[in-house]
From Swiss-Prot:
Protein name (record): Glutaminase
EC number assigned by the record: 3.5.1.2
Residues in coiled coil: none
Assembly mode: Homotetramer.
HAMAP family with a match to the protein in the record: Glutaminase (MF_00313)
Gene name of the encoded protein: glsA
Length: 308
């Protein structure tokens, strides 16, 4: 690789963006996330050949939230033919809030993409139809991808989200009214909230997602995770729809496929080179990590990396 990386570079980047802490807000609409310390800040890199770099709170676990939507899509791709998936969910950016009902009704219950709430719920509905134990299967997949056996769900976060699930339930019932949701709504919601409540660190996320930087293969696994074409498709979806309605702004500033979550995490992919994970719980108005985006911007400028 034509770049030099060490932990000191990442430490310097965190020092540059740390003054942003205090300018965002943690996700208060999920009570279990509202108590997270906003000053946390971490970054980690895993390269396609297995090198690891980290700085800050890179080994502290947090709720990955919507980052899990990429993982549920990966599992679905393993169990369904391509045409069946994309009949039920689209591939286009929404341009609307991630939990919007208005657009969903106008488009007759077909979500714009699998990374907004409606699309992720359809994906979870599909998994319910093919897996006897969807939550356990997700844990098995994530533990294998990461190479860490004790990754689990945060039961408190999952319960908190289920207790405040009116809007997501409305999304699911609306899709059911259009014939695009086939299983018991509360059961699928429980699976969805558990996926969001996966607890992982920046380093664990970087290892987990490195297969997307290497045409679907991970250095520590014997079998491909997805095909090269599927890896390209997932990266494309992340580039267009992974940062809620701010995908364009993120492409302008950072220039990498990425997926964020309201827990403050972001995973970004440099194709053929590395996966990057950042964490800072304070969010911008779109629900993306404020300092996390700034750290990724600093990193891509330092490395001279962009897919554009």
């Amino acid at each position: 690789m034509a770049w030099a990386m060490d932990n000191a570079i990442l430490e310097t980047i965190l020092q540059r963006v740390r003054p942003l802490i205090g300018q965002g807000k943690v996700a208060a609409y999920i009570p279990a996330l509202a108590s997270v310390e906003g000053s946390k800040l971490g970054i980690a890199i895993c390269t396609v050949d297995g090198q690891h770099y980290q700085a800050g709170d890179a080994h502290e676990r947090f709720s990955i939230q919507s980052i899990s939507k990429v993982l549920s899509l990966v599992v679905t791709m393993r169990h369904y033919p391509e045409e069946e998936i994309w009949q039920r969910v689209g591939k286009d950016p929404s341009g609307s809030p991630f939990n919007s009902l208005v657009q969903l009704e106008m488009e007759q219950g077909i979500p714009r993409n699998p990374f907004i709430n409606a699309g992720a719920l359809v994906v979870c509905d599909m998994l319910q139809g093919r897996l006897s134990a969807p939550r356990q299967r997700m844990l098995e997949v994530v533990r294998a991808l990461c190479g860490v056996s004790d990754i689990t769900y945060d039961a408190t976060v999952a319960r908190s989200e289920f207790e405040h699930s009116a809007r997501n339930a409305a999304i699911a019932w609306l899709m059911k009214s259009f014939g695009n949701f086939h299983h018991d709504v509360p059961t699928v919601l429980q699976n969805y909230f558990h996926y969001c409540a996966l607890k992982m660190s920046c380093m664990e996320l970087a290892r987990t997602f490195v297969f997307l930087a290497n045409q679907g293969e991970a250095f520590h696994l014997d079998e491909p995770v997805v095909t090269p074409m599927q890896a390209r498709q997932i990266n494309a979806l992340m580039a267009t729809s992974g940062m809620y309605q701010n995908a364009g702004e993120f492409a302008w500033r950072v220039g990498l496929p990425a997926k964020s979550g309201v827990g403050g995490g972001i995973v970004a992919i440099v194709p053929h080179e590395m996966a990057i994970a950042v964490w800072s719980p304070e969010l911008d108005p779109a629900g993306n990590s404020l300092a996390g985006i700034a750290a990724l911007e600093q990193l891509t400028q330092t490395l001279g990396r962009s897919v554009y």
